Amino acid sequence: MDQKRPQLKARVEGDYGEFVLEPLTRGYGVTIGNPIRRILMSSIPGTAVTSVYIEDVLHEFSTIPGVKEDVIRIILNLKELVVKFHAPGPKTLTLRAQGEGVVKASAFEVPSDAEIVNPDLTIATLAEDGKLVMEVRVEEGEGYVPADKHATKDRINSIPVDAVFSPVRRVAYHVENTRVGQQTDLDRLILRIWTDGSVGPQEALDRAVEILRDELTVFGNVETVSAAAPELPSVYTPAAPIVSGYDLPRQPELSINPQPYPADLDTPRVTLEGLGLTTRVLHSLKEEGIDSVDALCALSDRDLKKVPGIGERSLDEIKQQLAQFGLALRD
């Protein structure tokens, strides 16, 4: 029976998106969901603060007169700053605040080719005599980059900042059973994506699928891969022996020419449990004393239908599992 082509249904609300893909062949829910989740969490490009310069501050363990928060707290607040770029290249945001009040992200002077997505973010709290002057460098990147990996790209006394570039805050997926007509062994993949608002869930998913597709195209380019692959030696050359103070017994040489199975070798033995039958079917067979594959293969369709708990569906299951090992019921 032809399986219906999978359909994608999407529901996006702001920075949250839910995507349902069905029907999928059994097992494909995890096969598709897991790599997409990993790519979403690690490889979607985004922006982050990479360094900050604060006037009269030499290091992150300083305090600023007239400012409630210390420098470490201010840096932690800046890590939550979400900036959306409309053009490539690093951006410098400038902030000058003085006098009592709460300093929000909206106080930053932002270049025309960028915008702050969360302007209500609290940066610091100033007292009446407080003053805060800073420059923040924002860059594009992927994944997580620790502060010590950032080279000093701007002014002296700037403080490097750990950067989490990924615009995807969280990804969750799970797989459910679904059906199409009489076919019930199908998967439904439900994928949930939360972003920081600089990139929408649909855009993030599209980018993840594009990355995965690009990585997999190498498997379709067989001719190029074959031409570029180095020629392997036709004779196995053992590695040089390890020199030590002990005389180790000589190990037998590895044969690189596997011997074929004897022509009269029987089909490999398999236990009844090894057939992969469902617990219910396995229990029904053993209740009737059918406890081996030999005993099972000695029965016909008619014989098995007489076993309590074995109907048409169970009979089909038994035949399918036997066929995987080249076995069959008695005619």
UniProtKB/Swiss-Prot annotation:
One of its GO terms (molecular function) is protein dimerization activity. InterPro entries: DNA-dir_RNA_pol_insert, DNA-dir_RNA_pol_RpoA/D/Rpb3, DNA-dir_RpoA, RBP11-like, RNAP_asu_C, RNApol_insert_sf. Its EC number is 2.7.7.6. The keyword Lipoprotein does not apply. One of its GO terms (cellular component) is DNA-directed RNA polymerase complex. DNA-dependent RNA polymerase catalyzes the transcription of DNA into RNA using the four ribonucleoside triphosphates as substrates. This is DNA-directed RNA polymerase subunit alpha.
